Amino acid sequence: MHVQSQASSDDFFLQGVGSADPAVAEILAGELKRQQDQIELIASENIVSKAVLDAQGSVLTNKYAEGYPGKRYYGGCEVVDEVERLAIERAKQLFGCEHANVQPHSGSQANQAVFMVTMTPGDTFMGMNLDHGGHLTHGKSVNQSGKWFSPVAYGVRAQDHLIDYDEAYEVAKANNPKVIIAGGSAYSRHIDFKKFREIADEVGAILMCDVAHYAGLIVAGEYPNPFPHAHIVTTTTHKTLRGPRGGMILTNDKKLAKKIDSAVFPGLQGGPLMHVIAAKAVAFGEALKPEFKQYARQVIENARALAESLQSVGFKIVSNGTDSHLMLVDLTPKGVSGADAEIALERAGITTNKNSIPGDPLPPMQTSGLRVGTPAGTTRGFGPGEFRQVGKWIGEVLDAVASGEDPTPVEQKVRGEVLALTKRFPIYS
């Protein structure tokens, strides 16, 4: 008598998560509702297309493919080779470069792979101070980059919070770093990659540009391109690029390209996530369309509208504005910590993240600032008018918190108005 196994039954291949696992389905539905009903201002988040979701949830999740197209350690890779080659070609076209590795699982792992190529433990490198807008992987002591290597930092000028290139030059001259990192996670202004290359050449360093936050703006021509100045570029594929969560490494140097590929696999990772690479290919294809250029322009226009609105209700904006998708809000005039602001705004239906500001006297889990951004709101259709209103709501909520009175009535009022706005701009409906 033939007995069907679970894996060969119709239910296994046809049953969706709703009937197969109601507990997980309920959680997924809850997250969908949260995203639909809240205004997402976290600068590192975005909303992907249905096409990207479809690719990431595809049968490619079944396939192991250690190695690279045409040079795999497994059979049956002829189809996944096609999608990885497509992702690579689209990435090269977007950035105008000669080589792209689309396998890194994250931006952090992309950075780790570059460190493996360019340094040995104990070597010195230079990155932006985390409190001034840098990133954890640029030398923070709690991160691998700070534990294995010897980081030195440059920062921003006290008077205008713009990158202090003179300081960067002096720090580089004094320390002779092997690598200089240009880029950050909370720096809102243009970065002069040409000037960083000049500093790198002066001290014989490799210039690594981490453009994780700016990638979508770069490929749309709305933010300076690190090429031809960078030796190596790392990025995430989400954020402003509006793809799946993942990483990527780019270069024009053939010798570095070969070393980078070896560092990613087998040096750092095993099998690549082919379903994610397929989703990257889809997102890169979207970014090559004229509509994406319009989107990137709108992201920046919206960010400037939000910054102006926040200033109009009494907030300081670090560097007094933005050239990109994000801004740092200095909360000290309101006497509210970033942690308290984040919690109150979430109760009101607005999602942000606490963030240190230059010279911040508060610890990282409290902070004197908020980081806010416009990519997700722009994706769902918000324009300057909507973002000006969002700025006013932030002012209302945080003024209520600062007053010392119970902020609940104001939070609930704003929550209702936020919900009405999000209903006008639905996602995945």
Curated annotation (Swiss-Prot):
Entry's transmembrane regions: none
InterPro entries xrefs: PyrdxlP-dep_Trfase (IPR015424), PyrdxlP-dep_Trfase_major (IPR015421), PyrdxlP-dep_Trfase_small (IPR015422), Ser_HO-MeTrfase (IPR001085), Ser_HO-MeTrfase-like (IPR049943), Ser_HO-MeTrfase_PLP_BS (IPR019798), SHMT-like_dom (IPR039429)
Compartment(s) where it occurs, according to its Swiss-Prot or TrEMBL record: Cytoplasm
Catalytic activity: (6R)-5,10-methylene-5,6,7,8-tetrahydrofolate + glycine + H2O = (6S)-5,6,7,8-tetrahydrofolate + L-serine
SUPFAM superfamilies found in the cross-reference section: PLP-dependent transferases
Pathway assignment: One-carbon metabolism; tetrahydrofolate interconversion; Amino-acid biosynthesis; glycine biosynthesis; glycine from L-serine: step 1/1
Tree of life domain: Bacteria
Cofactor entry: pyridoxal 5'-phosphate
Annotated site, Plays an important role in substrate specificity, chain positions: H238
GO biological process: one example: glycine biosynthetic process from serine
GO cellular component terms listed in the entry, alphabetical order: cytosol
NCBIfam families per UniProt: PRK00011.1 (NF000586)
Assembly notes: Homodimer.
Function: Catalyzes the reversible interconversion of serine and glycine with tetrahydrofolate (THF) serving as the one-carbon carrier. This reaction serves as the major source of one-carbon groups required for the biosynthesis of purines, thymidylate, methionine, and other important biomolecules. Also exhibits THF-independent aldolase activity toward beta-hydroxyamino acids, producing glycine and aldehydes, via a retro-aldol mechanism.
Name this protein carries in UniProt: Serine hydroxymethyltransferase
Organism: Phenylobacterium zucineum (strain HLK1)
Lineage: Bacteria, Pseudomonadati, Pseudomonadota, Alphaproteobacteria, Caulobacterales
